[in-house]
Amino acid sequence: AVSDLAITRAGAMTVAELAVTGTPAIFVPYPYAAQDHQTHNARYMESQKAAVVIPQEDLTGETIYNHIAGLIGDDVRLQEMRKRMTEIGKPDAAKILAQQLKEISAQYQGVVPQPTL
């Protein structure tokens, strides 16, 4: 499915998926997440001009409507957000990680770890 804009929380997997798909976002970070990591995730994406952040305490129907209408009505900004989001995304991250693990494990081929007591 293709989306012009996502309105969502800012957990790590959500942010990563949006980046890989190049989907601009309005993030409403969950304020009670461990170590406030959702706010950190959202603010980073906002600092990269890939997203907008609305703190939950500021969220009203009018606020969200104004943000959505403003973004949907500004195709240049939405395209720039899409471009920035895509630049952040790592669509081949799993492949890169698998290759790195393969290289590391090759270094230890035949090595049997000694138990520690």
Go through each PLM region and give its residues.
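Nucleotide-activated sugar donor-binding and catalytic core shared by glycosyltransferases
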Residues: 1-117
